[in-house]
Regions:
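Ribonuclease/tRNase effector modules and their secretory precursors
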Residues: 1-83
Length: 83
């Protein structure tokens, strides 16, 4: 899957703030959405997710919602152990 659009909510409580709470940036998440290494489904929410390395080498999961075939809305992202 290739996302043409990634929607970020910069308002208080939005997905930008939530990602930053996990010491990640929107650039980290965008990079992994474009260069993921594995896909899956979140066991807690049932949402789709992708796994991959950030440019600085951290292995993260990005949980997102697909609003259409071209658009992803990141819900959360955080560092995880490599498989």
């Amino acid at each position: 899957m290739t996302w043409t659009h990634v929607l970020w909510d910069h308002s208080p409580g939005g997905n930008v703030e939530h990602v930053e709470e996990h010491d990640l940036t929107t650039d980290d998440v965008d990079y992994v959405l474009e260069n993921y290494e594995a896909t899956g489904v979140s066991s807690s929410s049932g949402r789709p997710c992708v796994f991959g390395h950030t440019l600085d080498g951290r292995y993260i999961v990005v949980i997102y919602e697909a609003t259409d075939a071209d658009t992803a809305v990141p819900v959360t992202a955080y560092e995880v152990s490599e498989p």
